[in-house]
Amino acid sequence: MLTVAILAAGKGTRMASSLPKVLHKLSGKTLLQRVIDSCNELKPDKIFIIVGHKSKEVKDSVFKNNNIHFIVQKPQKGTGHAVQVLSQKVKKHDGKLIVLNGDVPLIKGETLKKLIHYHDSQKADVSLITTKKKNPHGYGRVFAKDNLIEMIIEEKDCNNVQKSNLLINAGIYCFNWKSLSKIINTIKSNNKQNEIYLTDAIYLLKKSYSFEILDNGELQGINNRVQLSKCEETIQNLIKEKHMLGGVTFINPASCTVSEESIIGKDVIIDANTHIRGNSKISNNCKIGPNTFIKDTIINENCEIINSTIFNSVLMDFVNIGPYSHIRPNCEISSYSRIGNFVEIKNSQLDKEVKVNHLSYIGDSTVGKHTNIGAGTITANFDGKKKHPTFIGENSSIGANTVLIAPINLGDSVTTGAGSVITKDSQNNSLAIARTKQVNIENWKKN
């Protein structure tokens, strides 16, 4: 039986945030969820998440499944106390127990598997991951001989000589559950912080081993925003390298971000300052950016987007967007359509070869194929209480500076006169003009 305990009860005061530390995000996922995802690669029988500070928020953030359980640690008196609380709540202490913090988001499932294998090979009571750091500031120091641990001292309790030791405790343990259960509740808070340290279990167990790995960055804990930023950079580099090896060009990778969930096809060019978030999918031969933000959007082949923002929409093949377009949620823009500068579209469906080239707002609208929307066109869809739809048929031409007062239905091949305010439906093949007759006053002088 394999049990995992993730320690997520702390406040994270050094983050200087009202949000619990484990709920800060890296590339769209919370620190805690990243640790859970890595632990799930072990296929554990149960995962216990030890919560405390703002426990409801932490619980609500987790993607639930049947093997995840929550235990409240109150008050929070250290890592050893957290496992004491766990031990009192869990009736069976069989097999192995993995204990790790919820703020090590880069830890790999493969590394945890290696820890378990090492633990089994040594028939250990406890094995913990260690590594040598050039700058070990903030970490407890491990003192071992032939991988047998002699002592672990938290940095706060180290003297200057002990601080010179570079072998650190990564805070990731594999325990023999039965061995741990016999001694866990005997640990006391005999330290400057008046906390119960899990590391004190090392002295009470007979076979305590150091599993040393190279410092490749995955053991980085997060205690402040600087460390959060460094981890974000690490994750982003891995994501972008994967896409580049798969056939994507980044003009300036350092200025771009891509979510892990996003899918990008071959021969896509991502220009500088472009950010692709959420569950976005970009198909082959697209050009994206510069200065573009895309979230939860499907972009089909041969599209070009420049200096624009797109949320939760679908673009079919050969669509051109931008510069300075804003495509809001629930839009579908069909093939060979063109959305130009300073155009906002929301909750609308545009059929093939529709052109909205500049300075327009199209909301809650359906536009037929081959229709041209002139500059300055506005669909006035809100009456102060409700949103109303606009329907424009095929092969229509909406004149510049037209206002369409919804609800309204324009048929196929309808033309509106420039500067019109259209309030009534228009039938197929009609011309709609709604503006006052021009009056010229001769010999006019300003006062």
From Swiss-Prot:
It catalyses: alpha-D-glucosamine 1-phosphate + acetyl-CoA = N-acetyl-alpha-D-glucosamine 1-phosphate + CoA + H(+); N-acetyl-alpha-D-glucosamine 1-phosphate + UTP + H(+) = UDP-N-acetyl-alpha-D-glucosamine + diphosphate. Its main location: cytoplasm. It is an enzyme of class 2 (transferase). NCBIfam families: glmU (TIGR01173), PRK14360.1 (NF010940). Residues 247-447 are annotated as: N-acetyltransferase. Binds 1 Mg(2+) ion per subunit. Residues 1-225 are annotated as: Pyrophosphorylase. UDP-N-acetyl-alpha-D-glucosamine binds at residues 7-10, 21, 73, 78-79, 140, 154, 169, 223, 328, 346, 361, 372. Mg(2+) binds at residues 103, 223. Its EC number is 2.7.7.23, 2.3.1.157. Residues 226-246 are annotated as: Linker. It comes from Prochlorococcus marinus (strain MIT 9515). In the N-terminal section; belongs to the N-acetylglucosamine-1-phosphate uridyltransferase family. In the C-terminal section; belongs to the transferase hexapeptide repeat family. Keywords: Acyltransferase, Cell shape, Cell wall biogenesis/degradation, Cytoplasm, Magnesium, Metal-binding, Multifunctional enzyme, Nucleotidyltransferase, Peptidoglycan synthesis, Repeat, Transferase. The lineage of its organism: Bacteria, Bacillati, Cyanobacteriota, Cyanophyceae, Synechococcales. Pathway: Nucleotide-sugar biosynthesis; UDP-N-acetyl-alpha-D-glucosamine biosynthesis; N-acetyl-alpha-D-glucosamine 1-phosphate from alpha-D-glucosamine 6-phosphate (route II): step 2/2; Nucleotide-sugar biosynthesis; UDP-N-acetyl-alpha-D-glucosamine biosynthesis; UDP-N-acetyl-alpha-D-glucosamine from N-acetyl-alpha-D-glucosamine 1-phosphate: step 1/1; Bacterial outer membrane biogenesis; LPS lipid A biosynthesis. SUPFAM superfamilies: Nucleotide-diphospho-sugar transferases, Trimeric LpxA-like enzymes. Catalyzes the last two sequential reactions in the de novo biosynthetic pathway for UDP-N-acetylglucosamine (UDP-GlcNAc). The C-terminal domain catalyzes the transfer of acetyl group from acetyl coenzyme A to glucosamine-1-phosphate (GlcN-1-P) to produce N-acetylglucosamine-1-phosphate (GlcNAc-1-P), which is converted into UDP-GlcNAc by the transfer of uridine 5-monophosphate (from uridine 5-triphosphate), a reaction catalyzed by the N-terminal domain. Its cofactor is Mg(2+). It is found in: Cytoplasm. GO terms for molecular function: glucosamine-1-phosphate N-acetyltransferase activity; magnesium ion binding; structural constituent of carboxysome shell; UDP-N-acetylglucosamine diphosphorylase activity. This is Bifunctional protein GlmU. The keyword Glycosyltransferase does not apply. InterPro entries: Bifunctional_GlmU, GlmU-like, GlmU_C_LbH, Hexapep, MobA-like_NTP_Trfase, Nucleotide-diphossugar_trans, Trimer_LpxA-like_sf. GO terms for cellular component: carboxysome; cytoplasm; membrane. Homotrimer.
